Amino acid sequence: HNEYYGALGVGSNNTLGSHPTFIRWAIRLRQLRLTQWLDSLKSHLSPQKEFSDNLMKYVVKEQVIPYKSKLFQQGLEQFQNNMKLVLNLFKKHQIPVFFSTVGVNLKDLKPFKSISSDEHSADEYYQLAQEQLQAQDSIAAYTSFSRARDLDALRFRASKEINEIIRELA
């Protein structure tokens, strides 16, 4: 998700801190010609980085973002603040908005990064869900698949909290 690994995400190398006001101020500053010129000058003077190995290694600072961690919460706050800004802009210009939650593949996509904790890991919940599905207990399997997704420490799929924020804002 962009709030975690995208430009200015809480887990990216290109972050400007976690305070939304500072981030918006820095984005506006980047629009100034002087800032763009200084950035261009810096890139010409700095040695070029080699991206052939793996772009993700360069872009992502914090690859592992555990569920309910400080970075996880910051990503949720950033998502909620960004959504509120966009919705306020649409409201100001009287533009209708249609909402949708984020769909994710629970069954066919194993957790990317499973870490052990006090409770079961993402991999353990995924395996349990597979067993529950085999036993034709689809409700329990759905719950376990959902828990595996939420515990996946590589934040490429929307957690249940993202959809809760969307529902709350709708």
Language-model features, listed with the residues they occupy:
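Serine-dependent acyl-ester chemistry module
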Residues: 1-168
